[in-house]
Amino acid sequence: MFELIFPGWLAGVLLSLTTGPLGSFIVWRRMSSFGDTLSHSSLLGIALSIAFNINSFYAILILMSFIAIILAWLEELLPVSLDTVLNIISHSSLSLGMVFISLISSKKEINITNYLFGDLLSVTKNDLITISISSILILSILLFRWHSILSSTINEELSQIDGINVLYARLTIMLMTAFTIAIAIKFVGALLITSLLIIPPATAQHFSGSPEKMVIIAIIVSILSVTGGISLSVFYNTPASPSIVLCSSFLCLISNIKKHFY
């Protein structure tokens, strides 16, 4: 039994190392809709990968990176709220992806459930290697660019005065988030990956007094959620990814109760 669940648990832990800090930046920037936009657009990437018979990871990564670059640029130019643009792109790409998949499924057999909810317990050794390399790469970039990204998140005007390229810092976060989602979507699913990005940092903010502490607590909450969710899946035969999200939501609920009553 241990040999069956350990790869999935380890994959969840490795993903937590990146979703914790990236999710914290998304929460600080109040860009929770950004994660939804990328995860929903991944369905369009999946449809295109099936239609053109290319690797789904590359199709999703290219599409989401393109969307991230466009959004970083549009945020500088558009007079409307970024949330408005995010919602338009999110639902348009989701609808377009579902239409394409519906058209393709008449010729090819497609299991859309795996794309929507993932399968964390199907992780292979090669998957673990890919996730490990990706996590090391993203964490290295975050550590190297931590000051500029954090400064531009807290106050863009002061960051510009200090000579920080705010657009570049914003684009770095968006592209790293796109890369993480492209890696994780196979195991967590398009509909649940945003939850793993947003809920742990939302839980951690009630216990932290500094950005660094919030990131660490978000990672711990995420690892606890992965451990609890996989345990629930093993003992009660529930889907792994939804079980992880439920555990994460439960921890968030507990943190809110603590905030209001203690």
Swiss-Prot record:
GO terms for cellular component: ATP-binding cassette (ABC) transporter complex. It comes from the Bacteria. This is High-affinity zinc uptake system membrane protein ZnuB. GO terms for biological process: response to zinc ion; transmembrane transport; zinc ion transport. Keywords: Cell membrane, Ion transport, Membrane, Transmembrane, Transmembrane helix, Transport, Zinc, Zinc transport. It is found in: Cell membrane. Gene3D superfamilies: ABC transporter involved in vitamin B12 uptake, BtuC. It is a multi-pass membrane protein. Belongs to the ABC-3 integral membrane protein family. Involved in the high-affinity zinc uptake transport system. The chain crosses the membrane at residues 8-28, 54-74, 84-104, 129-149, 179-199, 215-235, 238-254. It holds the Pfam family ABC-3. Its main location: membrane. The gene is znuB.
